[in-house]
């Protein structure tokens, strides 16, 4: 599964399980990847925001990618997170991910230093020139304070190994404009579970999901129903899953997600600062939602 040029469907933005001493829980990670694949997920995305990549050292990021690639064993593509606001450092990460056997990269827009659209273009162009791996851009303005605009996405889509964008702007008009501006082969994916249905309805091809950590089969069914134009079923699934989608962000992600996965017995409820445990009332809401979906 090395060719992701036609990537579609649902991929999980994987959590990174930790032990109580804050080290990576490698055994839990291995089990979790196997769980995801057994439930029918289409691809895996380690070391993104949900994986707490800002708090992982370079060595830890390499180890997480190495484990996920090893356990996946070519059954599903592995698209490794390799982003940041230091272009030279991102290039280093990208090359490491390529060496470790990742099938592609997910690279978030530079945050905090607020580059211009030309700066964003040059940043991603430099990364693309430094690796042979296919790259999926990641636009998430609520987190980065910078918006990758349709003009810039269209320019970047001309670079051969920039093959898609994970869009989490929440602006369906912007997403539709991107889809209308890029080649048909360019992969536009939702970066927000709750935007999957509208994004695919205007021509998107899939989802990089947070909620699929808890319910990979359910989010895969939703995405597939949308892609196959089974809109009545898609709307029903969206209604069933919507509460969980939103609860995962009721406090700073991935704290609610890790609390839910701990209730499900998948991982320990351990995150690294500055992420802190959820409040008791949030825990109660999560427990109720998981029971409603028969996940606990």
Regions found by a protein language model. Name each.
Residues 2, 6-17, 35, 39-41, ...:
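C-terminal alpha-helical cap/extension of soluble enzyme domains
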Residues 3-12, 17-145:
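Active-site beta->alpha loop and helix N-cap motifs at the rims of alpha/beta catalytic domains
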Residues 20, 26, 58, 150, ...:
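Alpha-helix N-capping/helix-start residues
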Residues 29, 61, 65, 90, ...:
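A general structural signal for well-ordered alpha-helical segments in protein cores
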Residues 56-59, 92, 117-120, 148-150, ...:
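Short secondary-structure transition/capping segments
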Residues 129-130, 141-249:
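Catalytic alpha/beta core domains of metabolic enzymes, predominantly
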């Amino acid at each position: 599964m090395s060719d992701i040029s036609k990537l579609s469907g649902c991929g999980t933005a994987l959590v990174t399980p930790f032990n109580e001493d804050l080290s990576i829980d490698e055994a839990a990670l291995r089990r979790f990847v196997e769980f995801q694949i057994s439930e029918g997920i289409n691809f895996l995305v380690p070391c993104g925001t949900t994986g707490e990549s800002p708090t992982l050292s370079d060595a830890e990021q390499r180890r997480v990618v190495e484990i996920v690639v090893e356990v996946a064993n070519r059954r599903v593509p592995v698209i490794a997170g390799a982003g940041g606001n230091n272009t030279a450092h991102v290039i280093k990460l990208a090359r490491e991910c390529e060496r470790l056997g990742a099938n592609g990269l997910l690279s978030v827009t530079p945050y905090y230093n607020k580059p211009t659209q030309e700066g964003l273009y040059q940043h991603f162009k430099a990364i693309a020139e430094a690796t042979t791996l296919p790259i999926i851009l990641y636009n998430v303005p609520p987190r980065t304070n910078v918006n990758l605009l349709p003009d810039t996405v269209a320019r970047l889509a001309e670079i051969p190994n920039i093959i898609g964008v994970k869009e989490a702007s929440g602006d369906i008009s912007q997403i539709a404009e991107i889809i209308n501006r890029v080649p048909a082969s360019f992969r536009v994916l939702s970066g927000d579970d709750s935007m999957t249905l509208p994004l695919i309805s205007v021509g998107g091809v899939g989802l990089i999901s947070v909620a699929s950590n808890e319910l990979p089969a359910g989010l895969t069914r939703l995405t597939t129903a949308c892609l196959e134009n089974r809109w009545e079923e898609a709307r029903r699934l969206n209604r069933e899953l919507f509460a969980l989608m939103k609860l995962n962000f009721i406090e700073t992600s991935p704290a609610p997600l890790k609390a839910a996965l701990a209730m499900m017995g998948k991982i320990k409820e351990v995150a690294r600062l500055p992420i802190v445990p959820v409040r008791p009332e949030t825990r109660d809401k999560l427990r109720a939602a998981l029971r409603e979906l028969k996940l606990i």
